[in-house]
Amino acid sequence: MQKNIVSKGYEKMAENKKLITADNSFLTYMGRIDFSDKTRPEFYYAGSNVKMTFTGTSVSAVIKNHKYFNIQELGFVIDGKEGKVTFDKNDEDITLDIACDLEKGTHTVTLFKRQDASHYFEFVGFEIDPDGEVLENPPLPARKIECYGDSVSAGAVCEAVDFVASCDPEDHQGVYDNAWHSYAMITARNLGAQIHNIAQGGIAIFDNTGYYHAPNYIGMESVYNKLCYFPEGAKGVTPWDFENYTPDVVLFAVGQNDPHNEGHEDFDIADPDYRAKWKNAYKSIILDLRSKYPNATFVLLLTVLCHGEEWDKAVDEIANELNDQKITHFMFTRTGKATPGHPRLPEQYEMAEELTAYLSNMGDKIWG
C-alpha cells in the first residue's frame, strides 16, 4: 500500500525527443479503450492504462484532454514508483513530464486514468530520449477480470487517508481519486490478472436514478454495453464490442446509489413492487452478460460503504434466483458497515484482501 506520489507539470511538445506513437506495437493497453483511431486511442474508464518498456533517462506522455469537471490528473507508475501529473490544458496536444534524470538503462512506465467521467483523453504517445528505444513488453496476463461498479470500484476519494471511517472532505475536486488503488484493480494485480474496470461514481442500475450525470441521470443499464458512455464525447455514446475481451471473472458491484431519486422520496428496497422491478433490471444485465460470457464466474457484491442490509439481501436473492452455480454472492466482513464516506486506502486494501482470498479459494478452474 506504500506509494510514492509526486506531482509533475506539463509543457508543450518538446523538441529533441523521440515520439513513440500510440499505435506502436510494443505498447501494451489494458481497459475498455476506443481504438477506432489507433494513433489516438481514447481513454474513458477509470483505471484504463498503457504500458511501455524503454531505454533512456526521461519519459513524457503526449495527450489531448477533454475536461468536464474537477481538477485534472493522470497517474503513472515508473519502475515500481507511483506518481501523478496535474494539468489544466484542454482540447490541445500537451506533453506531460513524467520522469527525467533516470539512470541510463531499461525502464518501465504505465500511464493510467485515475478518475472516472470528470474527463476523457486521447493518448498520442510517449516521448523518450532521441537515442532511446522502445522494447517489447511481457505479454498481458492470461487471466481476465471485468468489474462493473460505482465510485468505490473507481477508487473515488480513496487517498483521503485523514478521513478514514469518516465522511468525505468537502470540495475535494477529485484530487483524492485513484482507480489504481480500488479494490477491484488491487485484486486483479494480486491474482495476476488483466482487468477492465467499468466503474463510474454515482451510478445506479436504472437511468434517472442515482447520482451520475445530473440532471439527466445515466444508469448501468445504459452503460454496461458501451465504450463511450456519456453523450458529451466527441463521438457521442458508442457501443462496446464484447468480442474484444472475454473475462474469466465478472465482478458486479452496483446498488449503493440506487435509493436516490432526485426531487422525490428515496426508493425503498423493502417495497415489494420496487424490489421486484429492481431485481429484474439487475438480472437482465447479468443474464445478458452471461450470454456473452458463458464460461465466466460472476461475483455479485456491494462494498463496505454504509448502506442498508436489505440491499445485500436483495442481491443474495438475485444470486439464488438465477440458479447458476457460477453466479455467487460475496459479502465482505464489513459490507455496508465500515464507513459513511468513500473507502480510503486501508479499506480498499481490506476489501481486496478478502476478495482475493475468495477468488483464490475457488481454485484454478475459474480461469480459462
Language-model features, listed with the residues they occupy:
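Active-site segments of SGNH/GDSL-like serine hydrolases
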Residues: 251-260, 282-317
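Conserved SGNH/GDSL esterase-like catalytic core that processes O-acyl groups on lipids
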Residues: 46-47, 169-271, 305-309, 346
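A structural motif corresponding to the C-terminal end of an alpha-helix
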Residues: 183-194, 285-297, 319-324
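Extracellular serine-dependent O-acyl
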Residues: 297-368
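Solvent-exposed, polar/charged alpha-helical surfaces in well-ordered, non-transmembrane soluble domains
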Residues: 185, 189, 276, 280-287, ...
